Curated annotation (Swiss-Prot):
Database matches in CDD domains: GIY-YIG_UPF0213 (cd10456)
InterPro entries assigned to the protein according to its UniProt record, in alphabetical order: GIY-YIG_endonuc (IPR000305), GIY-YIG_endonuc_sf (IPR035901), UPF0213_domain (IPR050190), UPF0213_GIY-YIG_endonuc (IPR022992)
The protein's name in its UniProt record: UPF0213 protein plu4503
Protein family: Belongs to the UPF0213 family.
Length: 104
């Protein structure tokens, strides 16, 4: 993966909480979260499960997509995980426009 290629991801905790983040290296970041060296909100909440990931373009675009996902309700995030959309940007746009969504 190129250094400037960002990934948006969702992790699920043992209690069912969904955490949204972005990274350039999903394997490294997941290991950091699992070892308690990632986000404070995930410490002690394991085991963690990677439930969604999608390429998100550059850092700016990834940050915008991350913000949009974080604004979704838990139900909408769970639907995102179930649908596993091919393009996260299109998926989020369809939610804003009230349209149905294509999945993988």
């Amino acid at each position: 993966m190129a250094e400037n290629q960002w990934v948006l991801y969702l992790l699920k905790t043992k209690s069912g909480m969904l955490y949204t983040g972005i990274t350039t290296n999903i394997h490294r970041r997941f290991a950091q979260h699992e070892n308690g060296k990632g986000a404070k909100s995930l410490r002690g909440k394991g085991p963690l499960q990677l439930v969604f990931s999608s390429y998100a373009g550059d850092r700016s675009n990834a940050s915008q997509l991350e913000y949009q996902v974080k604004q979704l309700s838990k139900q909408q995030k769970e639907r995102l995980v179930i649908c596993q959309p091919v393009c996260i940007a299109e998926y989020l746009a369809s939610i804003r426009n009230g349209q149905s969504v294509r999945s993988k």
